[in-house]
UniProtKB/Swiss-Prot annotation:
Keyword Disulfide bond included in the entry's annotation: yes
The protein's name in its UniProt record: Conotoxin Eb6.21
Major site of localization recorded for this protein: secreted
Keywords: Disulfide bond, Knottin, Secreted, Signal, Toxin
Swiss-Prot/TrEMBL domain comment: The presence of a 'disulfide through disulfide knot' structurally defines this protein as a knottin. The cysteine framework is VI/VII (C-C-CC-C-C).
GO CC terms: extracellular region
Residues in the signal sequence: 1-17
KW Phosphoprotein (keyword) present: no
Transmembrane segments: none
Chain positions listed as propeptide in the UniProt record: 18-41
More info: This precursor corresponds to allele E1e. Has not been merged with other alleles since they may differ due to geographic variation (see strain in PubMed:19606224).
Pfam entry (one): Conotoxin
Amino acid sequence: VLIIAVLFLTACQLTTAETYSRGRQKHRARRSTDKNSKWTRECTRSGGACYSHNQCCDDFCSTATSTCI
């Protein structure tokens, strides 16, 4: 009987959480887009100025000329 009660309460919580999140889906999607844009790496194309390899799209920065190759 205890196991059935626990399963019932768990199902109620999951249903309530799903119903509650439907009304907030627009805001949730916008937030995930903002987070993704922060994770997107901007890079300098070949011939552009650079100071380290991770700035270049091809991951190679010439230290002699400070340009992406």
